[in-house]
Amino acid sequence: MVTIKDFCAEMKSGATPSRSNPEYWSNGTIPWLKSGEVHNNVIHHTEEHITGEALSECSTKLLPYGTILMAMYGVTAGEVGYLGLPATTNQAICGMICKNKSDASWLFFTLLAFQKDISSQATGGAQSNLSKEFIERIHILRPQRNCSDLEKILHHIETNSAEINKLKTLQDLLLAKISSR
């Protein structure tokens, strides 16, 4: 058994650049993820984007492809995501950067398997939450061998979810064309 903190190379939580500064949001190209977008899924796109200025001037951090995410607050507390692109996040998400893709696959599926147990330990009044420190202390089994089978499964999930996103975009375009006739 090992803690998630010891299993991961690095753990980070994000931040929200000031919404009152349009230079942080207007024409942004850097994906910025809200905890409501973390739904036990592979994430290929985000609803919002920030600018390079926001990234350099605020405390949000660019997380690499393959980072494992856990929503920490509210209804989505305990839900897990796998970053299918480099992205930044808000402060309600804990990013877990693994040493390699095999470890990331293992951690993603382990957290999915224990998600209900983890989310049931969220504390708080009106809005339950998990702290980054709590997540760091979660104990998991360390894999005893290469997890290449899990990597293959995760690759299929990534491919399928990217295809689903493309199909949703096409569906939206077709519906817009049909309704404009």
Regions found by a protein language model. Give the residues of each.
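Non-catalytic DNA-recognition/assembly elements of restriction-modification systems
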Residues: 1-15, 27, 137, 141-181
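Sequence-specific dsDNA recognition surfaces
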Residues: 5-23, 36-65, 84, 89
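ATP-grasp fold ATP-binding core
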Residues: 33
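Short helix/loop capping segments that flank catalytic or ligand/cofactor-binding pockets
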Residues: 41-43, 80, 105
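A short glycine-rich beta-alpha junction/loop motif
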Residues: 73, 87-94, 124-147
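Short, positively charged
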Residues: 99-138
